Amino acid sequence: MADYIHIDVMDNHFVPNLTIGPAVVKSIRFVSKTYFDVHLMVTNPRRLLNSFAKAGANGITFHIETVDNPGSLIDQIKSLKLEVGISLKPATPLEEITPFLDQI
């Protein structure tokens, strides 16, 4: 049994693919106690936080390129009692996330 499941959620806007939503996460949560890291590869991650929290996510990873105020989003994720991860596209400088590393 896996200790960790990484779930890529794509919206066909931020990235050119479309994948699963909260209903699928909820369905697999019903049969698994494994840690779920939900990677929001979406244009507006804030819009999906509550749905994935209710579906059973343990952590949310968002892309730094999708938010104007990463600190606020980090606080919102933490307020849902979820762990936080930050991701970036290959062309995005690593320095974009360094100011937030002490918050995650």
Predicted ranges, named:
Residues 13, 35, 47:
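Active-site acidic carboxylates
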Residues 36, 41, 97-101:
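Chitinase-like catalytic core of GlcNAc-active glycosidases
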Residues 27-35:
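Short, structured active-site "lid" loops
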Residues 3-5, 58:
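Short acidic/polar active-site loop segments enriched in Thr and Asp
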Residues 7, 38-40, 62, 86:
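Conserved hydrophobic beta-strand within the GNAT/NAT acetyltransferase core sheet
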